[in-house]
């Protein structure tokens, strides 16, 4: 039986600015997304007949039609009926409901995996276009690396690869934040600040292109990068979830941590560390400051790629 294993990296947001409303109900965004080494593994195995089945090593993850792996497989098969039956098995390592694109990267891995498995020969832009139908951050997960993401997040502009940055990632395991709630609350509280015209939004994007964050990233300067992080959703999530605010503060004040910020709509928080030793020391400092068994911490790093093939057996 033919098998394939892929690694699906998580992402963090170095930058998330909400520019305004879109006619389709989404928000117009300007984001800098970054792939990190923490990732899931998706195994594909050829099966007799048609159809797809999904298993997972986490009992608390849906493995039915709601899962983006199956949604992605079914969407691709509608365009390419020659795709045969496949059994998927997911080794879940990215925390669930964390603002790290765990579901989207798994769906992206399904698209990439089926393309390889079935010999479709799709280009990356073709895969990204299909991914955009399934989720706003799924095109980024296909591409990976360091990207400026605009529109609702699906329009990608590659940025120069970063040197490997050491990171600490932290999340209360049982806590999740609804992404629609976070954006809806932001609209309620700050909608009067939205840019109302296309020229105004275009000018804002041009300013971001020429601004200090992208300059720091081009220079590979972690200290300067840390000085220019931004996540607009912190303004609504942190007051509503004080434990996330405390976690962000504690991590950000650890020795050797240059800055800390929430990723996406949360509740995960990441810190940029001076080096791997400082990252590991920060983990111990956070554990001492917040003695909660529900708090999970990881030491990881930035990477320059998206979905990658690990093994292919024929």
UniProtKB/Swiss-Prot annotation:
Keywords: ATP-binding, Isoprene biosynthesis, Kinase, Nucleotide-binding, Transferase. It catalyses: 4-CDP-2-C-methyl-D-erythritol + ATP = 4-CDP-2-C-methyl-D-erythritol 2-phosphate + ADP + H(+). GO terms for molecular function: 4-(cytidine 5'-diphospho)-2-C-methyl-D-erythritol kinase activity; ATP binding. Pathway: Isoprenoid biosynthesis; isopentenyl diphosphate biosynthesis via DXP pathway; isopentenyl diphosphate from 1-deoxy-D-xylulose 5-phosphate: step 3/6. The active site is at 11, 137. SUPFAM superfamilies: GHMP Kinase, C-terminal domain, Ribosomal protein S5 domain 2-like. The keyword Nuclease does not apply. ATP binds at residues 95-105. It holds the Pfam family GHMP_kinases_C. The keyword Hydrolase does not apply. Its EC number is 2.7.1.148. One of its GO terms (biological process) is isopentenyl diphosphate biosynthetic process, methylerythritol 4-phosphate pathway. Belongs to the GHMP kinase family. IspE subfamily. Catalyzes the phosphorylation of the position 2 hydroxy group of 4-diphosphocytidyl-2C-methyl-D-erythritol. This is 4-diphosphocytidyl-2-C-methyl-D-erythritol kinase. It comes from Synechococcus elongatus (strain ATCC 33912 / PCC 7942 / FACHB-805).
